[in-house]
């Protein structure tokens, strides 16, 4: 129930951002158009954003015949987590990473890059996929997918405001400085929403994944290895669609400054430390 409340609050917050930007571009008429657009985006995000994200990454669905070891691993972990079997996808990318998407556990999908399958041991890979299934079990996947879709739309509209300006309800041009301010601040506001939701969610998925696999040390080892390998291997699809970065088990974006400040993932060192403490104590609370 709490996740539904969070989802509703997220949609309301992003809708408010759309309305503010619409007001800057076109006054009261722009606000009305932005509201209608936001409602349409909310509907689209709920029903279709998972398909759109998988298409962005050119993810290919696999089964027991095309990727038998990986598919059986996901099925075994889903059974341990008491979850329906999700659809399973592979992404032809060297960068090691993985994510889950979908609107609920009955319509979930998990995806991993070919790079992560090469880099990690089977034990470490179990830890990663258990983490992704924890997102499914906690019903995080709808929130993360909606956030990714809406944040991308906010950035696009904000750029439109900066380059094309806007007019008030009387047709007069708005202050160009205000338009630039909206273009700069709206994506930051969207990033803050993503960050606030995503960081706590990653810790919970680490904990939940450790419970599902029964092996927190394996996930800790996987995170360390992904962190080291990913630093030197660009993830082209993620760089092209940065709003989806918060869906990944590890931040796939390269860069510093504001990008690090607004990172949607907690520090890898802290995640590893928490997992190692779970391994030491045998407690997952």
From Swiss-Prot:
It comes from Burkholderia multivorans (strain ATCC 17616 / 249). Pfam families: Peptidase_M48. GO terms for molecular function: metalloendopeptidase activity; zinc ion binding. It is an enzyme of class 3 (hydrolase). GO terms for cellular component: plasma membrane. Its cofactor is Zn(2+). This is Protease HtpX homolog. PANTHER family: PROTEASE HTPX. The lineage of its organism: Bacteria, Pseudomonadati, Pseudomonadota, Betaproteobacteria, Burkholderiales. Keywords: Cell inner membrane, Cell membrane, Hydrolase, Membrane, Metal-binding, Metalloprotease, Protease, Transmembrane, Transmembrane helix, Zinc. The chain crosses the membrane at residues 7-27, 30-50, 146-166, 177-197. Belongs to the peptidase M48B family. One of its GO terms (biological process) is proteolysis. The keyword Cytoplasm does not apply. The active site is at residue 132. It comes from the Bacteria.
């Amino acid at each position: 129930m709490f996740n539904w409340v969070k989802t509703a609050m997220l949609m309301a917050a992003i809708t408010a951002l759309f309305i503010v930007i619409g007001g800057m571009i076109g006054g009261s008429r722009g606000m009305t158009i932005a509201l209608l657009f936001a409602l349409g985006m909310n509907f689209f995000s709920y029903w279709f954003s998972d398909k759109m994200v998988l298409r962005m990454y050119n993810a290919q669905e696999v089964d027991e015949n095309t990727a038998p070891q990986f598919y059986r691993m996901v099925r075994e972990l889903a059974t341990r987590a008491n979850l329906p079997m999700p659809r399973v996808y592979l992404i032809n990318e060297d960068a090691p990473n993985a994510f889950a998407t979908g609107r609920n556990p009955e319509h979930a999908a998990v995806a991993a890059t070919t790079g992560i399958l090469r880099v990690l041991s089977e034990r470490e890979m179990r830890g990663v996929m258990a983490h992704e299934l924890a997102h499914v079990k906690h019903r995080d996947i709808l929130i993360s997918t909606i956030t990714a879709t809406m944040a991308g739309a906010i950035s696009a509209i904000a750029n439109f405001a900066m380059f094309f300006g806007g007019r008030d309800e009387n047709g007069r041009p708005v202050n160009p400085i205000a338009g630039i301010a909206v273009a700069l601040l709206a994506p930051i506001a969207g990033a803050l929403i993503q960050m606030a939701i995503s960081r706590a969610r990653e810790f919970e998925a680490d904990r939940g994944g450790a419970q599902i696999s029964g092996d927190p040390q394996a996930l800790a080892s996987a995170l360390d290895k992904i962190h080291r390998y990913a630093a030197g291997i660009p993830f082209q699809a993620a760089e092209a669609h940065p709003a989806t970065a918060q869906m990944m088990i590890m931040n796939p974006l390269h860069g510093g400054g504001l990008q690090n400040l607004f990172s949607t993932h907690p520090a890898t060192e802290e995640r590893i430390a928490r997992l190692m403490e779970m391994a030491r104590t045998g407690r997952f609370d």
